[in-house]
Every structure is written in C-alpha cells, then in structure tokens.
A protein has these predicted regions:
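N-terminal glycine-rich phosphate-binding loop and ensuing alpha1 helix
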Residues: 2-50
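Short, high-confidence coil segments that cap the C-terminus of an alpha-helix
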Residues: 43, 91-92, 119-122, 207
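Conserved core of the sugar-phosphate nucleotidyltransferase
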Residues: 105-191
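Short phosphate-binding loop-to-helix
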Residues: 47, 53-112
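A conserved hydrophobic position in a structured secondary element of the catalytic/binding core
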Residues: 50-51, 105, 175, 223
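Conserved alpha/beta core of the MobA/IspD/sugar-nucleotide pyrophosphorylase nucleotidyltransferase superfamily
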Residues: 166-236
C-alpha cells in the first residue's frame, strides 16, 4: 500500500460541544488519546490541525506534529487541506481525516480505510451498525448505501421513504490529495451548512463516497456532554 498520512482537525469552539477535544479522559485529554491511537497505525506521519493557539500549545506538549491553521476555515476538511498543501503533498498521496470525537479510534480501521482508498482511488469512509437509540439521535450521523457500497445519502434525521438500510457513519474520511484540492474549488453546499456535515460538499456536487464496514468496533463518538459522562462512567 502507498504511504498515507493522518490529519486530525480540531477546534475548541465546536457548536455542538465546546471544548470536547480537551475533555479529561483518565489523565489524558481526548485529542492526546486519539493522536496516540492514530500513531499506532501504519501512517507515515500523524498531524494535528487547529486554528487555536492555546490548543496548539497543549498539543505541543505531546507531539511536534502540530500545525496552526487559518482561522478562516469553515470546517475540518479545509484545515486538513491546508496541512496537506503546506507539506507539499502530491495528488496521489492518501490522507485520512480522523475526527476528534472518537476516543477509542482503532488503528486497524485507519489502516483498512487507507487500503480501500489505495485500492479504489475513490472517496472512502466507514460505517457500523446503528442502535435503536442512535437511529433517532440527531447527534449520530447516519448514511444509506446502495448495492455497490456507494453512499447515496448522509443525514442526521431518518426519513421513512429512504431506500436502503441506515448505518452509523464513523467519523473518518479517506481520499487522495487531488480530491482535497477539488473540495476547495467547490462552493459550500446547502446541506453542508444546514446539517453541519462537511462531506455534503462532495456529495451535492456528485462526488460520492464509498462506504465500508469498520473492521473493529469504533467505539462511541463523544458528541455531547452526556456522551462524555456515559463514556467516563462505563470506563471507570
């Protein structure tokens, strides 16, 4: 498999749960725990991308691979692009964008996602099964696949007339740098703004993701203070 890189975009002023990336998880902040897990993957390098100087300073306490990005970026994908551009990535370089809300992110899943990008040359992401509670939880992003493993929609709310079966989206994206350049050339999509789902900019412009089932249970996503409390309670 070709070399690949992991970039973790992070910010403190998240609309849904401010400061979650520095939540204390048994002596480590969340972004530190996620970074250490990503380092166990086969990635050539793992980088953190943030527009916040205080968060950058915190991260420099456990890694040198921190890039302070522009405050003008509208989402994590744009921050990932800046890192890749500044590091002179070439079009075929594979980038794995790992969201900073999965404290138990698996390096095996990261390697698998990178292998699928290498194999297909497509936009790729992962999914897992939904629980009944997650089906109606708008903090849980869902996706619907067709029979060719192509994702035909992402959503927060489920709707009755959807063809296909709902899956839980795992917050991890894989693509070649060429797709990141394309992303930056596209206008923001309406659903990107209304749903706060950055991948919809690709989707609404007919660049579709392939979805693959995660090899390892990706664990919970921390999307709310309640999620954090539950995670700590179950892991004490």
């Amino acid at each position: 498999m070709s070399n690949f890189y992991v970039v973790i975009p992070a910010r403190l002023n998240s609309k849904r749960f401010p400061n979650k990336v520095i939540a204390n998880l048994f002596g480590e902040i969340m972004i530190q725990k996620i970074y250490k897990a990503c380092e166990k993957s086969k990635a050539k390098k793992v980088y953190i991308a943030t527009d916040d100087k205080s968060l950058s300073d915190l991260c420099l306490g456990f890694t040198k691979n921190v890039m302070l990005t522009s405050s003008e970026h509208r989402n994590g994908t744009e921050r990932v692009f800046e890192v890749a551009k500044n590091l002179n990535f070439v079009d075929d370089d594979i980038v794995i964008n790992v969201q900073c809300d999965m404290p138990d992110v698996s390096p095996i899943n990261i390697d698998f996602l990178a292998s699928m990008v290498c194999k297909t040359g497509s936009l790729c992401t992962l999914y897992t099964e939904l629980s009944k509670e997650q089906l109606t939880d708008e903090n849980t992003v869902k996706l619907v696949l067709n029979n060719d493993s192509q994702i035909i929609d992402f959503m927060r709310k489920t709707y009755k007339n959807s063809s296909g079966k709902f899956k839980k989206h795992v917050g991890m994206y894989g693509y070649n740098f060429s797709f990141l350049k394309k992303y930056m050339s596209l206008n923001q999509a309406n659903s990107e703004l209304t749903l706060s789902l950055e991948q919809m900019r690709f989707h609404e412009n007919d660049y579709f993701f392939n979805g693959y089932e995660a090899i390892i249970d990706p664990g919970v996503s921390i999307d709310s203070p309640e999620d954090l409390d539950n995670y700590i309670h179950h892991n004490e």
